[in-house]
Design a protein with these regions (language model features):
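Phosphate-group recognition and catalysis centered on beta-loop-alpha active-site segments
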Residues: 16-290
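Bacterial Sec-dependent N-terminal signal peptides
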Residues: 1-23
Length: 290
């Protein structure tokens, strides 16, 4: 019965012409129900009415921009080319920055059951190129999709798991510009170095400062030399007053990753500008039934 209810709800969303007052972003595509950062997940997100696709990018050995949350094959989602599991102890050795993209494509990142997302469909998928994701989204949406792209950099990863920040940013910007989507793209990062380089190289592009659960929003903002358009904190760092204060200073507030219905309702009540969720269907349904 629950499965039937889910199917009916999904079909209703697919045919729904709701117009949410906030930016509903599909986290890693549609991770709650489809493999993360996959073409199929991004397409399903667009199918139900998501306007902004949120994703992460890393760099391969041959300087391809790859859509992946980690710069290695995460043991939670990846199977090796022989269909074998990868242990947590060995996952870091499957370093994407040391692998060509042809090698990366041989790994299945969707068939393994995801323990934290039991409703996620098991589909054989590979990590796509950013260019592939953009090509699909532009075709499906006729050039109306927005992109929120996280550049996955950390100081300790430089030259080991990722290129130096300047090179990393250049590769991402080159692709965004060549695809003509810069006006519909936000570049986000937890790494303030990366945002500084983005701002220097392409001051017109929108940026978002990510703040994790162990950081203080104000302290993180003080580490930047400029004012980003968006502050994107872990959702539990927010309350109504914090949101109001940030917005009064000219920032948009788009928290992550809001998945439970009660949390979604609470965050919406704060009058945020957007919500990043693994379950964009739940967020969109909240608007369609009101």
């Amino acid at each position: 019965m629950k499965h039937l209810f889910y199917l009916l709800s999904f079909m209703a969303l697919t045919n729904c012409n709701s117009n949410p007052q906030i930016d509903v972003q599909g986290h890693r595509g549609f991770r709650g129900l489809f493999p993360e950062n996959s073409i199929v997940g991004f397409k399903k997100a667009l199918d139900i009415g998501v306007q902004t696709l949120e994703m992460d990018v890393v760099i391969s050995k041959d300087n391809k921009v790859v859509v992946s949350h980690d710069p290695f094959m995460n043991h939670e989602i990846a199977l090796d080319p022989y269909g074998d599991t990868i242990s947590k102890e060995k996952e870091l050795s499957f370093n994407l920055y040391k692998m060509t993209y042809d090698s990366i494509k041989q790994y299945d990142c969707g068939s393994k059951p995801h323990l934290r997302f039991p409703k996620q469909q098991k589909i054989r998928v590979h990590k796509p190129l950013l260019d592939e994701v953009i090509a699909m989204a532009e075709k499906e949406s006729k050039g109306t999709t927005f992109y929120n792209i996280e550049i996955k950099s950390l100081p300790e990863w430089d030259t080991i798991y990722t290129p130096k920040v300047d090179t990393f940013v250049d590769l991402v910007l080159e692709l965004i510009v060549s695809r003509g989507i810069s006006e519909r793209t936000t570049l986000q990062s937890f790494d303030v170095r990366t945002l500084e380089v983005v701002k220097k190289k392409f001051p017109e592009i929108q940026t978002a400062l990510l703040v994790d659960e162990f950081e203080v929003i104000a302290d993180k903002m003080n580490n930047l030399s400029f004012k980003p358009e968006i502050i994107s904190p872990y959702f539990k760092l927010l309350n109504a007053n914090t949101v109001k204060d940030l917005q009064s200073k000219g920032f948009k507030v788009i928290p992550w990753t809001v998945n439970k219905e009660d949390d979604i309702e609470l965050i919406i009540s704060y009058k945020v500008d957007g919500i990043i969720s693994d379950y964009p269907d739940i967020v969109l349904n909240r608007f369609s039934v009101r």
